[in-house]
Amino acid sequence: MARTKSSRGFLGALFGRKKKAPARKKTSLLRKVTYMLIALFTGGGSIAGASEYDWIRTVWNLLRERIHAPTAAPSGTSGVDGDTGAIRVYFTHPENPPEQAGDIAHAVVGYIDATEQTLDVAAFELDNRIITDALVRAVRRGVRVRCVTETNYIDESGIKALRSVGVTVIDDKRDGALMHNKFMVFDHKAVWTGSMNFTENCAYRNNNNGVYIPDAHLAENYATKFAWMFEQHKFGAAPNKTDRIPNPLLTLADGTQVENYFSTHDHPANHIVNTLKLAKKSIHFLAFSFTHEGISTAMLDKHAAGVEVSGVFEKTQTAAGHSAFFKMRDARLPVFLDGNPRNMHHKVIIIDSEILIVGSFNFSDSADKSNDENLLIIYNRGVCAKFEEEFQKVLKIAREANP
């Protein structure tokens, strides 16, 4: 695209040496410019062979550095493990007995009980008793509840309970690929997502995370993906090549910048690799399954460049010998097998204590190319601090189990 006089003026206005706008206007400017770029160019094709949103993402990062660097969200008190501005963070506590470790499940129940009109549930599995009971209560008080699930778990107790009260449940009916999401959309206003399946094991025995984000634009993304699965029975890819998730780049009410991608159409692994390239000081990760060559290579490259790279792997997922654990161990990175007698189920990367990668997305080719998955990249020091605490806790247990 030729650079016209008007386009030079536009770029100059963005990146030229001008007096800084007042702080309260920075987020608004970033949002307006980003949305304008998306509106102008996502209608068709790609630029210089770039994958789906890569070129937009490049502009996003330039704008972020120029206009609005990551800032810590203010601390709050209403989240169980951490209320960091617009994002509430939760973790499981498998070191405690179930009757003392149910905070994350009770949090989900609280959000379900507060739902007034619509509730869309994408559940890889559903057998957690109190979450199921809350969903049934929602149906009985008139909330429209819809559900998509993985075919392999269509007969779980929670799915049967929903069907018994008239909820329509759609399963993916695919062999060799999974509907692996674990998210809920509340009243088209807020989203719950993370690594935790809505099960007894995941809530009480496995290491997991969940985030609650009240944002209508993010909810629109998840509602769009849900509709593709529930209404069009389209799992994995988008229904059509022209279909898009509406808000891949967004800014929350507290200024937190978020990227949001889904498998397979958004190629989340590419976005993970590109984000890893931003690392200057540290990369900390917790990985249930980690076999993706591109992601592991990006981490090893950063290690070679002097960035501290450290992580914990779920031990049962290394048995086949294909895990990135062995390559990293051979390169003498401080990586460990987890110490939970059950499963360490996180899928988390923390970069420079500023950027968090989180969601249902395991670091594997299947997650990127076959499954239905969701991924968030969150630029917020406060949220990263909460996940860093969890990383250090899991790392300590792993070190003690593997002296």
Predicted regions and their residues:
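Charged, low-complexity intrinsically disordered terminal segments
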Residues: 2-171, 177, 185-403
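Active-site microenvironments of hydrolase-like enzyme catalytic domains
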Residues: 180
